[in-house]
Amino acid sequence: MKRFLNKINCSIKHNKSKFKLTFTKSKIRKNFKKMSIVKNVGSKNIEFHFNKKRSINTFLFTKVKKALNG
């Protein structure tokens, strides 16, 4: 999972009820019109940010992966 995140140059951070997914390369960030996207997953929010580098957590990536597939 961490290898996948490294391939797309992104990372995840958990902040209380929010999950943050961050793209670390500006080239990737420029492909997104909005700099932030929030998705609800049950009682949690998954928040995608494209501006700051964060650490990777495998458990959180699993949650994000489920949210994207769902």
From Swiss-Prot:
Organism this protein belongs to: Paramecium tetraurelia
Cellular component per GO, a single term: mitochondrion
Keyword tags: Mitochondrion
Intracellular or extracellular location(s): Mitochondrion
Name of this protein: Uncharacterized mitochondrial protein ORF5
Primary location class: mitochondrion
